[in-house]
Amino acid sequence: MSTAITAKIISQAGKANPPSLVALYGGTLGERKASITEIENDLKAVGLNVIEFNARRYLSESDLCLPLVQQIVTELKGNAGNNGTTSDLVNRINESAPVILSTSLSSENRVEMIHQFDSAMKKLAAISIQKKPLVITLQGIERAVSGSFIKISEFISNYIN
């Protein structure tokens, strides 16, 4: 990571060592967006994979994890390459993701689908992230349903960390 990016993150977070999670507060929405865009461009310039997730686009969703999963899978798929293994993993993720968010499944079926999703997502992330590290930026999360940030943070730490 370039020192300019690190300096920006340190100044935004106000800490000596930047945490794995940095939140931008203060300033106008435009100023925060400009800072995030600048940081994203710097991250891309040094060869990192950047996913820009704007929660405002999905405010009608009760759970933001599914749109985030779709964005992450699209990015990881492109980074991992299009081969048989990648396609199989993506198909398993796409098949199981909406199902595990459903509340109408029996617990046995739900456990099976969670295992399928968990296994496929971790394998796809491992293949992709070895080739090109991944950074996810979240915007507009303050307007989402209460608890959305915690769910997204847990999801990212479970599969991408």
Where are these regions (language model features)?
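Short, glycine/acidic-rich beta->alpha junctions
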Residues: 5, 16, 148-152
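P-loop NTPase nucleotide-binding core
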Residues: 20-22, 34-131
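P-loop (Walker A) phosphate-binding loop of NTP-binding proteins
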Residues: 27-28
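Glycine-/small-residue-rich active-site loops that bind phosphorylated ligands and cofactors
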Residues: 31, 59-60, 143-144
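Conserved Walker B catalytic segment
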Residues: 109-161
